UniProtKB/Swiss-Prot annotation:
GO cellular component, one term: cytoplasm
Superkingdom as given in the UniProt entry: Bacteria
Designated gene of the protein: hslO
The protein's name: 33 kDa chaperonin
CDD domains: Hsp33
PTM annotation: Under oxidizing conditions two disulfide bonds are formed involving the reactive cysteines. Under reducing conditions zinc is bound to the reactive cysteines and the protein is inactive.
Function per UniProt: Redox regulated molecular chaperone. Protects both thermally unfolding and oxidatively damaged proteins from irreversible aggregation. Plays an important role in the bacterial defense system toward oxidative stress.
Similarity-based family: Belongs to the HSP33 family.
InterPro entries (alphabetical): Heat_shock_Hsp33, Heat_shock_Hsp33_C, Heat_shock_Hsp33_N, Hsp33_helix_hairpin_bin_dom_sf
Keywords: Chaperone, Cytoplasm, Disulfide bond, Redox-active center, Zinc
Location in the cell: Cytoplasm
Disulphide-bonded residues: 225-227, 258-261
Keyword Acetylation: no
Organism whose genome encodes this protein: Nitrosococcus oceani (strain ATCC 19707 / BCRC 17464 / JCM 30415 / NCIMB 11848 / C-107)
Length: 289
């Protein structure tokens, strides 16, 4: 199977270990088309997006999973978001030249947060320090502290593709260290070139052909920002009429840019009048953009 932009889930039936492989192609390039990122920033954002798709597939929820880093170094912010529909979006902010190296060199001192926003429920967030050689190690630290399940990730990205491989023991498998070490050792033989060049099924066969692996149907992944004029209107309405009138008086127009996809929205006085006329008919509800 040569299709890209797919998430593949698989299970080691005799070892009770689950795995996932995601390959992002057109969806990743759609993210890059919105911003001009330096090569190192590209790589980190691509790895974060691959990881977010992988992690979102480990839980049952309706909503979004957000991976975010905040740091004091050159790469100041990464935001990668995936939904239960397997859509993604992401952005990065940086300052000056971003060195290629360990997390401390690229990010400086910082933290990594994973937030699960579920429809109708309060968000859940877990935070760890940005520690380790790379983003995969930082996420492994998160899992070791939060879920206490053996977990390994391999993440790579270039200007064309972002790829991630995920392994995790099932709760009932805890204590079977020999199985885990064998599977993890097989996976650790994978190379960056293989991850970026081999079709998914070929890559999995190359790594695990001696194991009993059940491969589930692939799930398509796509880029979707999710911003819309309607959502922006709800955000503006939440500011209130007085605040909007103040901005319009000063600037003549309200301009809003989506940081994820760079789409531009304009709102003038006519738009404001229409917005608040409609709000009389339908009370404002808080919506996160």
């Amino acid at each position: 199977m040569n299709n890209r932009d797919n998430l593949h889930r698989f299970l080691f039936e005799e070892a009770k270990i689950r795995g996932e492989l995601v390959q992002l192609d057109a969806s990743w390039r759609a993210v890059l088309a919105c911003h001009d990122y330096p090569a190192v920033v590209q790589s980190q954002l691509g790895q974060a997006l691959a990881a977010t798709i992988l992690l979102s597939a480990t839980i049952k929820f309706k909503g979004s999973l957000i991976l975010q880093t905040q740091s004091e170094g050159p790469l100041q912010t990464l935001v990668a978001q995936a939904t239960h529909h397997r859509t993604l979006r992401g952005l990065a902010r940086w300052d000056g030249d971003v060195p290629h190296g360990s997390l401390s060199e690229t990010y400086g001192s910082g933290r990594l947060a994973l937030t699960i926003q579920t429809e109708g429920k309060n968000p859940y967030q877990g935070i760890v320090s940005l520690e380790g050689v790379n983003l995969a190690e930082a996420l492994q630290t998160y899992f070791s502290r939060s879920e206490q399940l053996r977990t390994r990730l391999w993440l790579v990205a270039d200007e064309q593709q972002a790829v991630g491989l995920f392994l995790q023991e099932l709760p009932s498998q805890q204590g079977h260290k020999t199985d885990w070490e064998r599977i993890a050792l097989l996976a650790s033989t994978v190379t960056t070139q293989e991850m970026l060049s081999l079709p998914s099924t070929e890559l999995l066969y190359r790594l695990f052909n001696e194991e009993q692996v059940r491969l589930f149907e692939p799930e398509p992944v796509s880029f979707r920002c999710g911003c819309s004029r309607g959502r922006i209107e709800q955000t503006l309405a939440a500011l209130g009429r007085e605040e909007m009138e103040s901005i319009l008086k000063e600037q003549g127009i309200i301009e809003v840019d989506c940081e994820f996809c760079n789409r531009h929205y304009n709102f003038d006085r006519v738009d404001m009048e229409q917005l608040f006329t409609e709000q009389v008919k339908a009370p404002v509800t808080s919506t996160r953009h």
